[in-house]
């Protein structure tokens, strides 16, 4: 076996080799510093040195590591697009300028890089000087991108050792974003194929995969591809950390696993998986030693909190200053005031009711009620629905002095989705609610993004039941009534609803194929604009939790099952019929 390894790895060093891998993922447009909770860094917070992150601090960490004499690699695992006023106003060109300034050794494409279609990716691919890699991304059927096909990998050299950096992007991009005719193939298959080619044809000794598919998929890559010794991942915003904590947290963040996750394989082979949370708050930092066979023998390191102890690089500040006036025209306008924290934390909004989700959905329902409605109806639709993954940030009333700005709202809703009207039956609506909780698992690495946020609906779930049979009870607002009230959802009855365009078009794997396109009406009303107007008209904001979503505990679930009786049997029959 050792002889075969030497034949596979020509030019292998006679001694162990050590390199420091710095990495980020899911920066989501946070080019300048933010608060520890991810909200905008106000002037007061900046003066008090309470803010973290930003590309200028990233650059300082990379420069300091290189100056120490270490063999440094700096990688990014995708999703620079979306999530901030900077991207909202400036788009892809600011991303290209930022990555050129940071000078990653390689970066992968995330699913959000495709949010503005094929055309939205062109500026990054044409203006970036950073190698963008993707072995499972096929542009051949997409005319706009065909000439810009990324290479599957790039080879860099450190201390005479050749290192292969192979990129990949989640196959789910097809329904998570708007990639047009771009195809995404199996990550592990293409990584193994490229790894074997790199060793055979280019004499590469160390193989690192960098990409955007999430921790569960990254673990699978480690298990299926023995050539890979390190996977630098993204997509799931997972905070891996093994250092000291205060009350189980680091800067307010609860670690979701060790850093790195170690996958032990046969014959003393192991593979490491790392991820760096999201929004550029930390810099992933791992030092790895490989032996003569290109296998990991030891490692050390932790994500570095990019706080005030790390100075901001002047060139990074100067880069942002060139665009600050353009951004500021939209950035600072005050929309409303809030008396409460508007909680958009993904570990709450994707797992349970959250008050920011309630506010957004109430704004949508109010907008629809303001439009002309059928005779005898007080509103145009009975309910509105969206996916919890569309809530991208909180609004912290303490750090902002209670003022909500245009920037704050764009940080929450950066995607520019619209509301789409349609008629659905109660059974079809229940099917959408079931899809929202079919992967619900509070213990998982990945809080699923598809939990249904709603206004005009009150839903009770029992997660102990089998997927697609978890809706215990649902009530919906009456529309042909002078005093709005919640009534039991009737599965055979037709209802008029509005849904966010993202899920209507298949986002988060929602299926609206039961509605013909000609029977859908896209209102054209954009989510962030609706919410800003609603906030302005209802200021000061005091949105609370109101019980519109309930997850039963085990004893409650038993009682609920006893009380459902014949309506429950009807529900079962309709669900079976719907899924045939």
UniProtKB/Swiss-Prot annotation:
<dbReference type="InterPro" id="IPR006179">
    <property type="entry name" value="5_nucleotidase/apyrase"/>
</dbReference>
<feature type="glycosylation site" description="N-linked (GlcNAc...) asparagine">
    <location>
        <position position="423"/>
    </location>
</feature>
<dbReference type="GO" id="GO:0008253">
    <property type="term" value="F:5'-nucleotidase activity"/>
</dbReference>
<dbReference type="GO" id="GO:0098552">
    <property type="term" value="C:side of membrane"/>
</dbReference>
<dbReference type="Pfam" id="PF02872">
    <property type="entry name" value="5_nucleotid_C"/>
</dbReference>
<feature type="binding site">
    <location>
        <position position="212"/>
    </location>
    <ligand>
        <name>Zn(2+) 2</name>
    </ligand>
</feature>
<dbReference type="GO" id="GO:0006196">
    <property type="term" value="P:AMP catabolic process"/>
</dbReference>
<keyword id="KW-0732">Signal</keyword>
<feature type="disulfide bond">
    <location>
        <begin position="478"/>
        <end position="481"/>
    </location>
</feature>
<comment type="subunit">
    <text>Homodimer.</text>
</comment>
<feature type="binding site">
    <location>
        <position position="79"/>
    </location>
    <ligand>
        <name>Zn(2+) 1</name>
    </ligand>
</feature>
<feature type="binding site">
    <location>
        <position position="26"/>
    </location>
    <ligand>
        <name>Zn(2+) 1</name>
    </ligand>
</feature>
<dbReference type="GO" id="GO:0046872">
    <property type="term" value="F:metal ion binding"/>
</dbReference>
<feature type="lipid moiety-binding region" description="GPI-anchor amidated asparagine">
    <location>
        <position position="555"/>
    </location>
</feature>
<keyword id="KW-0479">Metal-binding</keyword>
<feature type="binding site">
    <location>
        <position position="79"/>
    </location>
    <ligand>
        <name>Zn(2+) 2</name>
    </ligand>
</feature>
<feature type="binding site">
    <location>
        <position position="415"/>
    </location>
    <ligand>
        <name>substrate</name>
    </ligand>
</feature>
<feature type="disulfide bond">
    <location>
        <begin position="41"/>
        <end position="51"/>
    </location>
</feature>
<keyword id="KW-0325">Glycoprotein</keyword>
<dbReference type="Pfam" id="PF00149">
    <property type="entry name" value="Metallophos"/>
</dbReference>
<feature type="signal peptide">
    <location>
        <begin position="1"/>
        <end position="14"/>
    </location>
</feature>
<protein>
    <recommendedName>
        <fullName>Protein 5NUC</fullName>
        <ecNumber>3.6.1.45</ecNumber>
        <ecNumber>3.1.3.5</ecNumber>
    </recommendedName>
</protein>
<dbReference type="InterPro" id="IPR006146">
    <property type="entry name" value="5'-Nucleotdase_CS"/>
</dbReference>
<keyword id="KW-0862">Zinc</keyword>
<feature type="binding site">
    <location>
        <position position="392"/>
    </location>
    <ligand>
        <name>substrate</name>
    </ligand>
</feature>
<feature type="binding site">
    <location>
        <position position="111"/>
    </location>
    <ligand>
        <name>Zn(2+) 2</name>
    </ligand>
</feature>
<feature type="glycosylation site" description="N-linked (GlcNAc...) asparagine">
    <location>
        <position position="172"/>
    </location>
</feature>
<feature type="binding site">
    <location>
        <begin position="502"/>
        <end position="508"/>
    </location>
    <ligand>
        <name>substrate</name>
    </ligand>
</feature>
<keyword id="KW-1003">Cell membrane</keyword>
<dbReference type="InterPro" id="IPR036907">
    <property type="entry name" value="5'-Nucleotdase_C_sf"/>
</dbReference>
<comment type="similarity">
    <text>Belongs to the 5'-nucleotidase family.</text>
</comment>
<feature type="disulfide bond">
    <location>
        <begin position="349"/>
        <end position="354"/>
    </location>
</feature>
<feature type="site" description="Transition state stabilizer">
    <location>
        <position position="115"/>
    </location>
</feature>
<keyword id="KW-1015">Disulfide bond</keyword>
<keyword id="KW-0378">Hydrolase</keyword>
<dbReference type="InterPro" id="IPR029052">
    <property type="entry name" value="Metallo-depent_PP-like"/>
</dbReference>
<keyword id="KW-0472">Membrane</keyword>
<keyword id="KW-0547">Nucleotide-binding</keyword>
<keyword id="KW-0449">Lipoprotein</keyword>
<feature type="binding site">
    <location>
        <position position="28"/>
    </location>
    <ligand>
        <name>Zn(2+) 1</name>
    </ligand>
</feature>
<dbReference type="GO" id="GO:0008768">
    <property type="term" value="F:UDP-sugar diphosphatase activity"/>
</dbReference>
<dbReference type="InterPro" id="IPR004843">
    <property type="entry name" value="Calcineurin-like_PHP_ApaH"/>
</dbReference>
């Amino acid at each position: 076996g050792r002889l075969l390894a030497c034949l596979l790895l020509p030019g292998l060093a006679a001694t162990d080799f050590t390199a420091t891998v710095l990495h980020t993922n899911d920066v989501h447009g946070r080019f300048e510093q933010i608060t520890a909770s991810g909200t905008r860094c106000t002037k007061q917070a900046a003066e008090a040195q309470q803010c973290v992150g930003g590309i200028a601090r990233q650059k300082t960490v990379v420069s300091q590591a290189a100056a120490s004499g270490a063999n440094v690699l700096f990688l990014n695992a995708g999703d620079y697009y979306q999530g901030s006023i900077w991207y909202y106003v400036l788009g892809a060109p600011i991303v290209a300028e930022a990555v050129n300034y940071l000078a990653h050794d390689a970066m992968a494409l995330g699913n959000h890089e495709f949010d503005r279609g094929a055309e939205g990716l062109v500026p990054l691919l044409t203006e970036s000087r950073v190698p963008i890699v993707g072995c499972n991304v096929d542009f051949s059927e997409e005319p706009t991108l065909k000439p810009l096909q990324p290479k599957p990998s790039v080879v860099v050299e450190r201390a005479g050792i050749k290192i292969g950096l192979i990129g990949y992007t989640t196959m789910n991009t097809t329904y998570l974003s708007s990639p047009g005719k771009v195809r995404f193939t199996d990550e592990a298959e293409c990584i193994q194929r490229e790894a074997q080619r790199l060793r055979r044809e280019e004499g590469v000794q160390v193989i690192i995969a960098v990409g955007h598919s999430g921790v569960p998929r990254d673990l699978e890559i480690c298990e299926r591809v023995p050539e890979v010794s390190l996977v630098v991942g993204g997509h799931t915003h997972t905070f891996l950390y093994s250092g000291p904590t205060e009350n189980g947290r680091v800067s307010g963040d609860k670690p979701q696993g060790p850093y790195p996750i170690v996958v032990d394989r046969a014959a003393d082979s192991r593979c490491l998986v790392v991820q760096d949370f999201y929004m550029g708050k930390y810099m992933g930092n791992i030092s790895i030693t490989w032996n003569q066979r290109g296998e990991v023998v030891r490692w050390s390191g932790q994500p570095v909190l990019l706080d005030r102890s790390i100075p901001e690089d002047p060139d990074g500040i100067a880069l942002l200053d060139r665009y600050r006036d353009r951004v500021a025209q939209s950035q600072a306008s005050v929309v409303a005031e809030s008396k409460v924290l508007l909680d958009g934390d993904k570990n709450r909004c994707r797992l349970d009711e959250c008050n920011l989700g309630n506010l957004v959905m109430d704004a949508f329902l109010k907008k629809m009620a303001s439009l002309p409605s059928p005779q005898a109806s007080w509103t145009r639709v009975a309910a509105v629905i969206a996916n919890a993954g569309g809530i991208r940030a909180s609004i912290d009333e303490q750090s902002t002095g209670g003022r909500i700005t245009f920037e704050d709202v764009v940080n929450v809703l950066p995607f520019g989705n619209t509301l789409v009207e349609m008629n659905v039956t109660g059974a079809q609506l229940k099917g959408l609610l079931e899809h929202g909780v079919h992967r619900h698992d509070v213990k998982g690495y990945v809080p699923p993004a598809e939990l249904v946020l709603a206004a005009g609906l009150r839903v009770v779930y029992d997660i102990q039941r089998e997927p697609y049979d978890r809706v215990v009870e649902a009530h919906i607002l009456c529309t042909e009534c002078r005093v709005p009230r919640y009534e039991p959802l009737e599965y055979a009855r037709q209802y008029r609803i509005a849904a966010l365009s993202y899920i209507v078009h298949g986002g988060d794997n929602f299926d609206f194929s039961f509605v013909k396109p000609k029977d859908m009406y896209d209102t054209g009303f954009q989510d962030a604009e609706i919410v800003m107007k609603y906030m302005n008209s209802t200021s000061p904001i005091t949105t609370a939790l109101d019980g519109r979503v309930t997850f039963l505990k085990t004893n409650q679930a038993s009682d609920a099952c006893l009380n459902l009786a014949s309506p429950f049997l009807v529900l079962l029959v309709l669900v079976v019929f719907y899924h045939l």
